[in-house]
């Protein structure tokens, strides 16, 4: 009698095991999609298994898409900051690397801007040198020796100075369209 119960229990376990699809089987060998849609509707376990598999595939593909999208957005941001070079981008860049290996900082950029402003102011004033008044400049140029040993001529110095002033005045007074 015990053997009949044992055989019946074993038979019930086999039937119950055939109804359930273990997770290991579905992961190791993918199910073929040659079954028709009517077969899938008939077997609810099959529908749950395929649904779980498709959700996992979708989640995996979606996370890969999000990763590539984030990487693409980061590259676009980098390109825009390099292209625009606006104040926000300069604030984040401590140094800008040049091909010859030198670095320029925000301080040197500021100093270059200041030097440009001083040069424009110097052009507007029309002076020969930035640091010295006109009289001192003329005296220094008279005392300076050329490479061949002769002294600079006072007349040439004065004419050069006047020509420079006339040129700067012409630049300031004429419009850009008139210069062409």
UniProtKB/Swiss-Prot annotation:
Residues 1-20 form the signal peptide. InterPro entries: Glucagon (IPR015550), Glucagon_GIP_secretin_VIP (IPR000532). The record marks 52-53, 83-84, 91-92, 97-98, 130-131, 145-146 as: Cleavage. Induction: Glucagon release is stimulated by hypoglycemia and inhibited by hyperglycemia, insulin, and somatostatin. GLP-1 and GLP-2 are induced in response to nutrient ingestion. Residues 23-56 are annotated as: Disordered. Pfam families: Hormone_2 (PF00123). It is found in: Secreted. The modification Phosphoserine is found at residues 54, 105, 108, 150, 152. One of its GO terms (cellular component) is extracellular space. Glucagon is secreted in the A cells of the islets of Langerhans. GLP-1, GLP-2, oxyntomodulin and glicentin are secreted from enteroendocrine cells throughout the gastrointestinal tract. GLP-1 and GLP-2 are also secreted in selected neurons in the brain. Proglucagon is post-translationally processed in a tissue-specific manner in pancreatic A cells and intestinal L cells. In pancreatic A cells, the major bioactive hormone is glucagon cleaved by PCSK2/PC2. In the intestinal L cells PCSK1/PC1 liberates GLP-1, GLP-2, glicentin and oxyntomodulin. GLP-1 is further N-terminally truncated by post-translational processing in the intestinal L cells resulting in GLP-1(7-37) GLP-1-(7-36)amide. The C-terminal amidation is neither important for the metabolism of GLP-1 nor for its effects on the endocrine pancreas. GO terms for biological process: adenylate cyclase-modulating G protein-coupled receptor signaling pathway; glucose homeostasis; negative regulation of apoptotic process; positive regulation of insulin secretion involved in cellular response to glucose stimulus; protein kinase A signaling; regulation of insulin secretion; response to activity. Transmembrane segments: none annotated. One of its GO terms (molecular function) is glucagon receptor binding. It comes from the Eukaryota. The keyword Signal applies. PANTHER family: GLUCAGON (PTHR11418), PRO-GLUCAGON (PTHR11418:SF0). Belongs to the glucagon family. This is Pro-glucagon. It comes from Octodon degus (Degu).
